[in-house]
Each structure stands twice: as C-alpha cells, then as structure tokens.
C-alpha cells in the first residue's frame, strides 16, 4: 500500500450521480449476470445448510458471511478494469490473505454501528453509511480492517448525504426484489454490489493493485 497515494485519494472531491451509477451498475452486471446470480444462490444454499446444523449453524454463518460475500467485489473490480475472471474468484475472500480482515470488518464495523444505534440512533446510521466502502478498500488497497473502516469513513464523509440517498434507493430496490416472490433479490442484490463498487472504483480504485488477479 502506498500511504501517500491513499491519503491523496481520501482528499478527492466527488459527486454521486445516482442515475449514472444505477446505469453503470447494470451495465457492469450484464457480463457476469449468470455467475453473479449463481454465486448469490450458492451463498443462500450455504446459509441454509449451515443453519440446519446444531450449534455450528448459529456461529458459522456469521463467521464466513463477510469473507464469502466479498467475493463479488473482486469480480466486479476485475470487470471494471478489463480483466478476466473465473467462478473461483468469487471465493477469494475465504483465502488466508483476506479472511481475517474481512471478518473483522464485519464484526467491528457491525459492533460500532450497533453501539451508535443505541446512542440516539443517528451515530449508528452515520457509521452504517460511512463503512460502505470498507470491503473494497480492504481488498483493493490491502488494508487491515480498521484502516479500511477509517478509509471508508473519511471518503464517505466528504459526500455523506449523497451516499446515504444512494443507499436508501438501493435498499428500496432490494425490498422490491423481495416482494417479487423473493426471487427478485437474486438480481437486485448483485446489482447493488455492482452499483457500490462502481462508485468506489471511480473515486478510490487502486488500479495498480493486482488483488483482482491474484488469490
């Protein structure tokens, strides 16, 4: 990681053009639509299987969910940078290089958000929105979990309200996906990831990093 380059990235001004990123997210999803939907089905099935196992089913999903779901970030970054990908790339988050940091991002970020919610709600909402880029920062800049959380918070804070509105609309889209007999979520959830990663990549993407090429 080049600390000076990252510091410069965190000082960038940017605007969140909601219409642009919904369109760009959809355009990015199309080349990987089948694999992406298949990956989310795999996540769903893994959670169903784990949930059926006594004791383990109460712990394992929480441990592996963040590293597993982060796989879509690797693939979307590869597509945006004109790189090829294989289905196995969806599971890069489970590798030794990334697993612990991604798990800690989920654990610590989640705990801080919950604490914020307990203190008058608003701090929790602020942190929930602020940490939206933590996973992309971790895998793209090889950051440790707290560095990734802080990098995301600093960047989002420059246009927090715009990012908040984007996430509200993404949330509404996913609610609509659930209302469509529950199956629509397998389209809206991958699209949500594409939208968020497209925005991240335009603002802070580390195009010199080979994370999207190496396990």
Question: Predicted segment positions?
Answer:
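Midchain, well-structured core segments that form catalytic/ion-binding scaffolds
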Residues: 50
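Selective recognition of hydrophobic, aromatic-rich stretches within alpha-helical transmembrane segments
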Residues: 2-9, 13, 53-85, 113-150, ...
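Interfacial aromatic "cap" segments that immediately flank transmembrane helices
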Residues: 16-46, 84-115, 127-178, 208, ...
């Amino acid at each position: 990681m080049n600390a000076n380059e990252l510091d410069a990235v965190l000082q960038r001004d940017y605007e969140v053009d909601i219409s642009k990123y919904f369109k760009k997210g959809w355009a990015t999803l199309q080349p990987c639509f089948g694999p992406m939907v298949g990956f989310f089905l795999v996540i769903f099935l893994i959670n169903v299987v784990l949930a059926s196992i006594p004791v383990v089913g109460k712990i394992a999903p929480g441990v592996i969910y963040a590293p597993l779901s982060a796989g879509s970030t690797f693939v979307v970054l590869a597509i945006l940078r004109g790189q090829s990908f294989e289905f196995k790339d969806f599971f890069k988050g489970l590798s030794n290089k990334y697993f612990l940091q991604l798990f800690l991002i989920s654990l610590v970020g989640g705990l801080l958000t919950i604490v914020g919610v307990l203190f008058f709600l608003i701090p929790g909402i602020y942190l929930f929105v602020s940490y939206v880029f933590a996973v992309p920062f971790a895998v793209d800049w090889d950051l440790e979990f707290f560095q990734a959380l802080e990098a995301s918070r600093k960047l989002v804070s420059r246009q927090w309200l715009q990012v908040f509105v984007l996430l509200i609309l993404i949330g509404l889209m996913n609610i609509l996906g659930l209302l469509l007999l529950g199956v629509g979520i397998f389209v809206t959830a991958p699209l949500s990831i594409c939208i968020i990663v497209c925005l991240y990549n335009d603002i802070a993407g580390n195009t010199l990093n080979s994370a999207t090429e190496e396990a």
